[in-house]
Amino acid sequence: MENVMKKVGKASSFLTKYIGIIIICFSVIAFFWRDGFAWTTNYTSIFIGVAMFGMGLTIKMDDFKRVFSRPKEIVIGFVAQYTIMPVVAWGLCQLMHLPTDLALGVILVGCCPGGTASNVITYIAGGDVALSVGMTITSTLAAPLMTPLLVYLLAGAWVEVSFLAMVISVVKVVLIPVLLGILINWIFGKQIQKISEVLPLISVVSIVMIISGIVSVNAEKILSCGLLVLGVVALHNLCGMGIGLGAAKLLHIEYNKATAIAIEVGMQNSGLAISLATANFAANPLATLPGAIFSVWHNISGSLFAGIRRGGTGTKEACLEVTE
């Protein structure tokens, strides 16, 4: 049994590290074999809830201590997360005169919390992983208020947004699963520790299923507007990382911490954006497309950014450990 867990753990680490490539492969398969993945769109909220539960299982009480022990960087990251990406999303939609569905999808991505993949990318970049984890936790736990509020304020020009319905959606697919995961980890910490290397696999499988489903049911529309969405998504992501890094430098934050902030700001929980689009904006089916394409793109750009930052000044002092 122990050997089996080790093998599964290695597979989990491999899949997590190369999630961008895996998403691309499954997206291509789903594009051509649409019937094989279309069914997953009926379970988008369940998949994202499972992914969030998996994230919760990895969070320990010590992680919250780290959050409160470094309030300056956490606050800077939090403010950057919920200002830069939403405002850039809104600006791009206005600048490029996006149709309603796509504008809504881009704004949904911009208003979501940081994605869990950012922690892996931060590690690869030689950034401060503890800070990255802390920012992901705080932005995720604040999402039931911040995400609906920002979507209500920014997307109202395109569609009618029900603030309360969105709050309920985020609570169901994010807050409850994450808190449940944290509670189980707190009660059964030793047992969870034994399978800790396997846990990322839960999120990987869930996100791959979500994106594959969206690609399969929107294949024809991807052909007609995929390049436009990719261009907007790429600009959105690169602006987020660039402005996040610039803000960190302006505030004289250390190299490895600035790396973590830039990655955290630029990489979003796009799976949540897809789930919210599916649950709350059924009349705007293309609103799921920016989230799906963002999921592919930000893993690619994040990995490239990590390679650049890892080879830069300051990486020798980088915090590569989750604990300090």
Task: Give residue ranges: language-model regions.
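Alpha-helical transmembrane segments of multi-pass small-molecule/ion transporters
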Residues: 1-324
